[in-house]
């Protein structure tokens, strides 16, 4: 599946989730005012989600280019790399104002696209993310991803995605 197709699927899912959220949410204001003007809100949310998905996918592809794939066969380095990517997605989601549902969908798609997890593994992994403390070892790995994507997008370090290759080697030899 190409990156473009993945992005279309993510945007479609986001639009449907947001549509259902608006359609099935009881609201006294909506019943008094008649139909709500949810169209622009859905369109805006879908655009933000598409933007995050595109940036996250590009970052994941750039990060995975130099990674030793053999090192990712061990669960430790693979899970650590997934935590790193989760941090990057989290940073992008926060920066663009995505909600939890959209963040979850993008994270699952990016982890699967990067080859770090299967669809089922990515779903379980992303479901566990809210329970991880920022001060835990896992939280620190997520912070590395957040810091790296920030450095990349701010122009501080154009080679920032290559840091993942170095980290994977460190994790594989630890």
List the model feature ranges, each with a label.
Residues 1-38:
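N-terminal signal-anchor transmembrane alpha helix of single-pass membrane proteins
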Residues 2, 8, 99-103, 171-173:
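Basic/polar, acidic-poor N-terminal "presequence/leader" segments
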Residues 103-120:
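Short, mixed-charge aromatic SLiMs
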